[in-house]
């Protein structure tokens, strides 16, 4: 999705980031976007398209380094960028490498990235410094 400027009444665009839970559609976070030049919001996740076999969940997201489905605890990655193609590519790439390497990569590349992962049965968030500095709702 790409938004530009603000709504007709002057208020920012509100975009929901979905809570990464299978079989449910709930909001994890609301972003309020009002960048004059426009911004794309792209999210990749492992929580919608998957199958389970032998007690293991296998995602439709494949790690290009192994050719196998990703199996780490990162569930969702959202990237904000002016270019929708780059935002989409980066959200998938960061999801492939997991939250630790993804966070390092997001920082080194100056990406506005939000990571949602599972830890001890709870959903946790982390974000790049560029995302936390972006003009969005917390």
Language-model features and meaning:
Residues 1-138:
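Mature catalytic core of soluble alpha/beta enzymes
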